[in-house]
């Protein structure tokens, strides 16, 4: 049986393995830092500007909360950026830095 899945969630769950999915806004310094970090490390990512999502941040948070059982999204995370890898929620910029430290120091 098939069911409807939001295009937002499809971007997360359908990304290639090892590809980060980042929801950001251009004017956010934490978003810019996350994008720069991924670029500097030559890590694959797909970036999606939250301003281009119909309903912007409130809609994004609503969808991510609705489908949190699939992605592990924490509904208490309400800041930008919002980052996933391998279909699972990482967090924001600080969480990305911790994730990369663990991944690259083992």
From Swiss-Prot:
Disulfide bonds join 28-31. Gene3D superfamilies: Glutaredoxin. SUPFAM superfamilies: Thioredoxin-like. PROSITE patterns: GLUTAREDOXIN_1, GLUTAREDOXIN_2. Keywords: Disulfide bond, Electron transport, Redox-active center, Transport, Virion. It is found in: Virion. One of its GO terms (cellular component) is virion component. Belongs to the glutaredoxin family. This is Probable glutaredoxin. It comes from Acanthamoeba polyphaga mimivirus (APMV). The lineage of its organism: Viruses, Varidnaviria, Bamfordvirae, Nucleocytoviricota, Megaviricetes.
């Amino acid at each position: 049986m098939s069911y409807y899945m939001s295009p937002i969630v499809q971007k997360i769950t359908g990304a290639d393995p090892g590809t980060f999915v980042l929801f950001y806004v251009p004017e956010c310094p934490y978003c810019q830092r996350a994008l720069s970090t991924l670029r500097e490390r030559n890590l694959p990512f797909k970036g999606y500007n939250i301003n281009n999502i119909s309903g912007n941040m409130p809609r994004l948070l609503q969808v991510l909360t609705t489908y949190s059982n699939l992605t592990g999204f924490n509904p208490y995370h309400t800041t930008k950026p919002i980052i996933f890898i391998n279909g699972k929620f990482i967090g924001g910029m600080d969480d990305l830095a911790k994730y990369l430290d663990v991944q690259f120091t083992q």
